[in-house]
Amino acid sequence: MVVDSDATSVRRKSLLVFALLFLVGCASAVEGPLVDRRGWVIHREFLPHSKASNKKVELLWTQPAGDGPWPAVLFIHGHQLVRDGGEAYVKTGALGLMARRGYVAAAVSQPGYGNSDGPADFCGPFTKDAVLTAIAFLRKQPSVSPNKTALYGYSRGAIVASMVATQDQELAAVILGGGAYDFFKWYPTPLAGIDANIKFESGLSDEAFKARSALYHAEKIQSPILLLHGTNDERVPLQQARAFAAKLQANHIPIRGRIRGRCMINLFTPE
């Protein structure tokens, strides 16, 4: 029989206490407000998904001091190696920054990211409906001007935001950065990893591609669009933004574009 020494016993007890504290910390991380690096309080909500009430949609949001109402902006992240979802915008201080500028600022976690229930469907209908769930919540807040709600989507988030805009005609503005708007022309993509994710999460059917390609639904968009893209974007060729812009212009949608020489300009957080 092996008998533990006092030192070994103490070490094991210390590790047990550490593990318990770690688990408690993980549990508390998904409940209650957060505080960003500049001390701004961020609220965390778990909303029932509009098409699957047993699944939750994570929304993080904050507002300026005072009563409002204020315009609102909802951020939609791209793919992440560390899948922290909307919390990325808390860590960078983006939500607090926008609140100081007079906006109700929010970030939604796409299904399969952060604390939002999956599965991830590569910018598909389940993700689109999760974003619509978040928008509906924001518009009901007394601090929000419901007719002044805007979206900012980056990469995958831009794909989702563009499809949301085909369904929600009341959006005040939509900012799309580095997105793909025609899956038929994009696939196969420049990166094998993206191809694998598309095949696994959405499948390769015409129906799946059309459900994620805003170019084929552009006539339904009513909101002003700002397109941001990079000439050397390694994920999505610039032609995707140009073709989408031409389609929007043909439908008389107010549009502005900004092209950067090397890569997509990302105002708040890296993918």
Walk through the language-model features, giving the residues of each.
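Mobile cap/lid helix-loop segments that gate and shape the active-site cleft of serine hydrolases
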Residues: 84-85, 179-217, 223
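Short substrate-entry loop that stabilizes the transition state in hydrolases
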Residues: 68-70, 78-117
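Alpha/beta-hydrolase active-site loop
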Residues: 121-142
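Alpha/beta-hydrolase fold nucleophile elbow
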Residues: 144-155
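Short beta-strand/loop motif that positions the catalytic acidic residue
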Residues: 221, 227-229, 233
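C-terminal catalytic histidine-bearing segment of alpha/beta-hydrolase fold enzymes
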Residues: 242, 249-271
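N-terminal cap/lid segment of alpha/beta-hydrolase-fold proteins
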Residues: 30-67
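Short glycine-enriched nucleophile-adjacent loop
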Residues: 158-169
